[in-house]
A protein has these predicted regions:
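Short runs within selected transmembrane alpha-helices of multi-pass transporters and secretion channels
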Residues: 71, 141-160, 168-176, 197-212, ...
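Hydrophobic transmembrane alpha-helices of multi-pass small-molecule transporters
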Residues: 62-65, 179-183, 209-213, 286-289, ...
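Helix-terminus/linker motif at the lipid-water interface of multi-pass membrane proteins
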Residues: 29, 33-51, 120-129, 185-192, ...
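Small-residue-rich hydrophobic transmembrane alpha-helices
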Residues: 50-110, 149-168, 274-340, 371-396
Length: 451
C-alpha cells in the first residue's frame, strides 16, 4: 500500500488510505481504553497509588517520547526512500534505527534504575511518603521496560512507514491485552498493587517488542533487516535519522519537561487535585483518538509523497488528514462532554476530585475541537518534510511561555487551581496552531533535502 508506480496519478487511493487508517484507529482506541482500564485497576488501591502512577508516568512519557523521536526520524527517512522506490536504502535505514534505539534505551534504562529515588526527588520534590514509596517501586520496574517499548515504537513506526499499520495494531493488541490480564492477576489476584501494575506493563512490552521484531523479518517486508552486518552503526543513515530525531527529541523532551514542571505545580494543590488531573488526562485521551490516528497516518503519507517529488499531493493529503482529524475530534469531544458526569464515577474519586476533573475536561472538549489538530496533526506533515527544527522551535517557545509560565501565574497569582493549569495548555495550543498554519501555507517545509 505504498505509493503507486506512476507518480502522475494519486499516490494513495481512498482504499489505500482507509487500509492505513482503520488499524491505526483501532490501535489508538485499544491503547486509550486499555490505559483507562489500567488507571481504573490501580484506582482500587487508593488515591496515593493513582497519584504515584500519574507522577511517574509523566516522567516515563518524558523519557519514552525523547527516545521515540528517533523512531519518528527513522520513519520519515524510510517513507521517503520507499516513495523514491529505493528499498535497499530504506532497509538499511531501518536496521540503523533498531541499532540506535537498542543502544540508547538500554543506557537510559540502566541510569534510571540506579538513580530512581534521586531522580524522583529532583523532579517532584517533597511529596507524601506513601506516594513516594509507590512511585519508586513503579519507576524502577518501568525503567526495565524502556528497551522493549523503544524497539516496539521503532518497529511500529517502520511498519506504518510502508503503509502496513495492521502489524502495529496487532502488536498493540498483544501488549494491551497482556497488560490488562496481568493487572487483573497481579493487582487483584496476588494483591501486589502498584508493583503488580508495573510488572504487567513490563511483560506486555516485552511481548510486543518480540512480536514486532519477529514480524519485521518477514520475507515480504521491504524494511526487514537483511544482514546482521546492517546493524553495525553507519554514519550517513544515522545522521539522516538524527536530522529528524534530534530536533524531534529535543521538542518532545522540552515539552515533557514543561509538563513535569506543571505536574510539580499540580502536586502542590493536594492529593485530590493530583488524582483529578490524572483521571482528566486519562479520560481526555478518549476524545483525542481521532486526532492521534490522523497524526500517525500523516508521516507515512506525506513522507512518501515528498520522497516521490509530489509536493502538491503532499499538501492535498495533509489537508485531507487534518480535516478528518477535526471532524473526528468534534464528534468525540461532543460525546465526552455529555457523558463526563457518568464517566468520572468509574474512577473511585472523592467528591472534590470528581468535580475538578469534570470541570477541566469540559473546557478541554471545547478547545480540542478547534485547536488540537492544528497543534499536533499538522506539525507531523512538516516533520515528514524534514522541517523538524521549525516545529521544535515553535513547540519549545510556546510550551514554556504559555503552558508553563502562564500556569504558574494562573495558579499562584490568580488562584485558579487546576483550571489555571489547563488554561495554560489551551493558550499554548492557540499559539502553536497559528505558527504551524502560517508555515504550512508558505510551503517552505517541503524544500528540505532529507535523503
Amino acid at each position: 500500500m505504498t505509493a503507486t508506480a506512476k507518480s502522475k496519478g494519486p499516490l494513495f487511493t481512498k482504499r489505500a488510505l482507509f487500509t492505513l487508517i482503520w488499524p491505526l484507529l483501532l490501535e489508538q482506541t485499544l491503547s486509550v481504553t486499555m490505559g483507562m482500564a489500567d488507571t481504573l485497576m490501580v484506582a482500587g488501591v487508593g488515591e496515593a497509588a493513582v497519584s504515584s502512577v500519574s507522577l511517574v508516568d509523566s516522567l516515563n512519557i518524558l523519557i519514552i517520547q525523547i527516545l521515540s523521536a528517533l523512531a519518528t526520524g527513522g520513519a520519515v527517512i524510510a517513507s521517503q526512500y520507499l516513495g523514491r522506490r529505493d528499498e535497499e536504502n530504506a532497509s538499511r535505514s531501518a536496521a540503523q534505527l533498531y541499532s540506535v534505539l537498542g543502544i540508547s534505551t538500554v543506557a537510559v534504562g540502566v541510569v534510571c534504575m540506579l538513580l530512581s529515588r534521586l531522580i524522583l526527588r529532583i523532579v517532584f520534590g517533597s511529596i507524601d511518603e506513601d506516594v513516594m514509596r509507590f512511585a519508586q517501586q513503579y519507576f524502577l520496574i518501568s525503567a526495565v521496560s524502556y528497551p522493549f517499548i523503544g524497539l516496539y515504537n521503532g518497529g511500529a513506526a517502520l511498519f506504518r512507514a510502508q503503509g502496513n499499520s495492521r502489524i502495529s495494531m496487532l502488536a498493540s493488541l498483544v501488549m494491551n491485552v497482556i497488560n490488562i490480564a496481568g493487572n487483573a492477576l497481579l493487582i487483584y489476584g496476588f494483591g501486589m498493587g502498584v508493583i503488580g501494575a508495573a510488572l504487567a506493563t513490563l511483560i506486555g512490552r516485552v511481548f510486543a517488542a518480540v512480536f514486532i521484531l519477529w514480524q519485521n523479518q518477514d520475507l515480504h517486508n521491504p524494511l526487514r533487516v537483511q544482514r546482521f552486518a546492517d546493524l553495525r552503526p553507519r554514519r550517513r543513515p544515522i545522521m539522516q535519522i538524527l536530522s529528524i530525531g534530534i530536533p524531534s527529541g529535543l521538542e518532545n523532551g522540552m515539552f515533557q519537561i514543561g509538563k513535569l514542571c506543571v505536574s510539580s505545580l499540580t502536586s502542590t494543590l493536594g492529593t485530590s487535585a493530583i488524582a483529578a488531573n490524572a483521571v482528566a488526562n486519562s479520560v481526555s485521551t478518549l476524545a483525542n483518538i481521532p486526532g492521534n490516528t490522523m497524526s500517525l497516518a500523516t508521516i507515512p503519507v506525506i513522507g512518501q509523497c515528498l520522497g516521490a517529488g509530489e509536493k502538491k499531493q503532499a499538501q492535498r493529503y495533509s489537508g485531507i488528514l487534518r480535516g478528518s482529524a477535526i471532524t473526528g475530534l468534534a464528534g468525540a469531544n461532543a460525546a465526552l462532554f455529555f457523558l463526563m458526569p457518568e464517566v468520572v464515577t468509574w474512577f473511585n474519586l472523592s467528591a472534590a476530585a470528581s468535580a475538578m476533573c469534570t470541570h477541566v475536561v469540559h473546557w478541554f472538549n471545547l478547545f480540542s475541537i478547534f485547536f488540537w489538530a492544528t497543534s499536533f496533526t499538522l506539525p507531523n506533515a512538516l516533520r515528514a518534510g524534514g522541517d523538524a527544527k521549525f516545529t521544535m522551535s515553535v513547540s519549545i517557545v510556546s510550551m514554556w511561555l504559555f503552558r508553563v509560565i502562564l500556569s504558574y501565574i494562573f495558579v499562584l497569582q490568580f488562584h485558579l487551581g487546576l483550571t489555571g493549569v489547563w488554561f495554560g495548555m489551551f493558550i499554548d495550543w492557540i499559539c502553536r496552531s497559528l505558527c504551524f498554519l502560517v508555515r504550512f501555507a508558505r510551503g517552505k517545509w517541503m524544500e528540505h533535502k532529507v535523503i
